[in-house]
Design a protein with these regions (language model features):
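Short acidic, glycine/serine/threonine-rich loops at helix termini
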Residues: 106-110, 136-142, 173-178, 202-206, ...
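Active-site microenvironment of metallo-dependent hydrolases
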Residues: 1-29, 33-39, 44, 90, ...
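Divalent-metal coordination cores built from histidine and acidic residues
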Residues: 6-7, 84-188, 495-499
Length: 570
């Protein structure tokens, strides 16, 4: 085709090609496609148009390589088909997902099914082997994953490396982490980092162990230090954190930025529904003054090269024809999207709805904890008052220690909404025998009611927080009856719920419907006094042992920095 000796299978005419190699944008030209690849670019050769050649007139619009989200979490909340309807339809042709949530929820059985769903998804879904399931087995319980099962996932052809491994496990020489790294290095696969808080000698040790990336830069200085050590810098902008404004200026004017990427780390629901996964990130990069072709490279060529996805990530001869035609380089709205040269979407909609991937009935029976009556949430103490240790929120993801004096009634320590002190519980979801720990939480603002969810990071155990034992029981039993999800209760009523029956963490519903139910839960909590804009993010992270300082697990209250259990009653 390039030599003008054969017709193209498809032809895109008058397209401005965004070149991610030299960061130039061409004048309107033609792009010939054949056998799922880009065959030629330039003035149209007479032979390119054959009797069966499909022709698309771009009319001066911009042709980009398909976008690649190099770090996200597609193993909870929604299925991959519904995600594709919003991501692929806007030009996001590939995603690299962590699997830690599914591993914690359902172990190897869930991972095998999720990989089967990924193989059948409309867009390309690559995965990362979950490294530490759970991260700290001495503190917490999850479904678990043996080293043999880890190696099975790592060897999968669509698995590109080891998922984010917390830096203390690496520099402290944790045996599981070292074995995982060695297995991946033997296969030539990447080692994804989670270097939050690591600097200087610790960060160097983390890199020296073989870690290849970090998505935890929260400042320009963080990004510069990681780049200087040879780490790929993945800049987050999504549901959990938004760091482009702080970090992008450090990357914008570098002579060479091949180690830079923009990632969602899980796309914000509203952004995903309105504009797509990486599209809002490209728009923000443009607003921050990044040259459009450079920003596109951060979301295409750079991830492809980093993960060794040869012949992906560019509009160039021989490259896979995963392409998006966008109307402008400010909002990056996609008119057409191709996957391997086949048109898949037009004006933000897939041409064919994705075929539903149906999980077996066992998927909805993974929450195995026993019934949780009100008395399960009673914490015994003598006398009429008790002084307790309290986990206080210090932002969405960090906690600190506080103390409170609480009333004891009939031998049970009560919550005190007047002091903004709730009772909380962390229940092992994997045991038919009741295994749980109780504690107290501050920073929720609830005046009445309770919330419950098992969508907590890494372990996916059941977290409950509330003003009374009866309301905690109602919220927890609602989640248990749904097989997983979110619930808000007050008095004797369930005010809102979001069922997540697949592995206890995924809904089969369309993403907008999942978002609607999550918003119902947020509004219900707001009506009960909770002022948080994202209360369930706080719920997800409140028991997360990967960040400081005080965390409640199913085994007890943990001081993460001191690396020991501490007493609730003082």
């Amino acid at each position: 085709v390039a030599l003008g000796r054969a017709p193209a299978e498809a032809l895109i005419t008058h397209a401005r090609v965004v070149n991610v190699f030299n960061h130039q944008i061409s004048a309107p030209t033609s792009v010939a496609l054949a056998q799922g690849r880009v065959a030629a670019i330039g003035p149209e050769a007479p032979a390119w148009r054959g009797p069966d050649t499909q022709v698309w007139e771009a009319g001066g619009a911009y042709l980009l390589p398909g976008l690649i989200d190099a770090h996200t979490h597609l193993d909870s909340m929604f299925q991959l088909g519904p995600y594709s309807e919003l991501a692929l339809a806007r030009g996001n042709t590939s995603a690299v997902t962590e699997l830690a949530m599914m591993a914690g929820a359902w172990g190897i059985n869930g991972l095998r099914l999720l990989l089967a769903e990924a193989a059948a998804a409309p867009l390309r879904v690559f995965s990362l082997a979950p490294p530490l399931v759970p991260p700290f087995p001495e503190w917490e319980t999850s479904a678990g994953l043996s080293f043999e099962n880890f190696k099975e996932i790592l060897a999968h052809p669509d698995c590109l490396g080891v998922g984010e491994t917390y830096w203390p496990a690496i520099i402290d020489g944790e045996e599981r982490a070292a074995m995982n790294y060695a297995a991946a290095q033997a296969l030539g696969k990447t080692l994804e980092g989670h270097g939050a808080g690591a600097r200087g000698a610790r960060l160097m040790a983390y890199a020296a162990a073989g870690t290849t990336s970090c998505h935890e830069s929260v400042s320009a200085a963080d990004a510069a230090e990681r780049l200087a050590l040879g780490l790929a810098v993945m800049v987050r902008e999504g549901f959990v954190r938004r760091e482009m404004a702080a970090v992008v200026p450090a990357l914008r004017d570098l002579p060479e930025s091949g180690q830079a990427m923009l990632v969602t780390d899980l796309a914000d629901f509203e952004d995903l529904i309105a504009a797509g996964a990486l599209n809002p990130l490209l728009a923000k990069a443009a607003a921050l003054g990044v040259a459009p072709a450079r920003a596109v490279a951060w979301c295409s060529l750079n991830p492809a090269r980093y993960f060794g996805l040869r012949y992906m990530g560019a509009v160039a001869p021989g490259y896979v024809a995963d392409l998006a035609l966008v109307e402008d380089l400010q909002e990056f709205r996609a008119r057409w999207v191709w996957l391997e040269g086949r048109l898949k979407a037009q004006q933000g909609r897939l041409l064919q709805p994705p075929q539903a991937f149906v999980y077996p009935p066992s998927a909805s029976a993974t929450l195995r904890c026993p019934p949780l009556p009100p008395e399960a949430f009673c914490l015994a103490a003598p006398g009429g008052r008790a002084r307790v240790r309290v986990v206080e929120a210090a932002g969405d993801t960090i906690t600190k220690e506080a103390q409170a004096e609480l009333k004891v009634a009939q031998g049970n320590v009560l919550a005190d909404p007047g002091q903004d002190v709730l009772k909380m519980a962390h229940v092992n979801r994997h045991s038919a025998e009741l295994k749980m720990a109780l504690g107290f939480a501050k920073g929720w603002g609830l005046r009445q009611g309770a919330l419950a969810t098992n969508l907590i990071w890494d372990t996916t155990n059941l977290f409950v927080a509330g003003c009374s034992e009866a309301e905690m029981s109602l919220a927890a039993e609602t989640v248990r009856a749904m097989g997983g999800g979110l619930a808000v209760a007050a008095g004797q009523r369930v005010l809102a719920r979001l069922p997540l029956p697949i592995g206890g963490i995924i809904s089969p519903e369309p993403v907008p419907e999942v978002h609607r139910m999550a918003e119902d839960c947020r509004r219900a909590l707001a009506g009960l006094g909770c002022p948080l804009p994202r209360p369930f993010l706080r719920a997800q992270t409140f028991c997360f042992t990967g960040l400081p300082f005080l965390r409640l697990t199913d085994k007890g209250l943990v001081d993460v920095r001191a690396r020991k259990f501490v007493e609730v009653l003082l």
